[in-house]
From Swiss-Prot:
Bound cofactor: record note: Binds 1 ascorbate molecule per subunit.
GO MF terms held by the record: dioxygenase activity; ferrous iron binding; L-ascorbic acid binding
Gene3D superfamilies (alphabetical): q2cbj1_9rhob like domain (2.60.120.620)
Organism: Bacillus thuringiensis
Cofactor(s) needed for function: L-ascorbate; Fe(2+)
Keyword Heme: no
Protein family per UniProt: Belongs to the iron/ascorbate-dependent oxidoreductase family.
Function comment: Catalyzes the hydroxylation of L-isoleucine to produce (4S)-4-hydroxy-L-isoleucine. Can also catalyze the hydroxylation of L-leucine, L-norvaline, L-norleucine and L-allo-isoleucine, as well as the sulfoxidation of L-methionine, L-ethionine, S-methyl-L-cysteine, S-ethyl-L-cysteine, and S-allyl-L-cysteine.
Enzyme Commission identifier(s): 1.14.11.45
Protein name: L-isoleucine-4-hydroxylase
Pfam families registered for this protein in UniProt: 2OG-Fe_Oxy_2
Catalytic reactions on record: L-isoleucine + 2-oxoglutarate + O2 = (4S)-4-hydroxy-L-isoleucine + succinate + CO2
Keyword Metal-binding found: yes
Biotechnology: 4-Hydroxyisoleucine is a natural nonproteinogenic amino acid that exhibits insulinotropic biological activity and increases glucose-induced release of insulin.
Amino acid sequence: MKMSGFSIEEKVHEFESKGFLEISNEIFLQEEENHSLLTQAQLDYYNLEDDAYGECRARSYSRYIKYVDSPDYILDNSNDYFQSKEYNYDDGGKVRQFNSINDSFLCNPLIQNIVRFDTEFAFKTNIIDKSKDLIIGLHQVRYKATKERPSFSSPIWLHKDDEPVVFLHLMNLSNTAIGGDNLIANSPREINQFISLKEPLETLVFGQKVFHAVTPLGTECSTEAFRDILLVTFSYKETK
């Protein structure tokens, strides 16, 4: 991926200093062909099945294993997802199982470039322990809201993630959607920043230095509104 005018080292320093980072979508859309690849990726969200663990959400999840002694990413047969109660007071403490992400989405060159970019960025930080085997998790999530039923994230309020580095890529947002904005806080009682991602592939990166939350998604229209995201998470492979 070409990164004209983008210094990854400077952005990593900014991220480590603040605990979060905004990344423009231009970094992912510099090639003309990426616009059509984005459209293909967006269409896949219409096929997501409902999230069994939360209303008004649809979701799929797959994960790669990156072993220390290999440059390759190996698609894991397991798509179990676990968060501790400490970090997710709504759904933590239990193993959640989601449908796997479609091969067409995983093999989309744009998505593959995004995962490579996220991995390179994460590896340049002083946060990731490069001596451990990594899990690179991909979460496709569609938040679906109607006039009577808003859609909530999990957990619904300020929290930190289990994973030391998390990328949030906005994939699509209907123009009838209200909310779905990101809050950044230095403590659970102090909201310091309000960030609205509006354009596809606008991105936020979170570490464990800050708390963050997503406001509920709603709409005033009679038709359903949606917000589609791709989370790319970095954590360590379970030891047995």
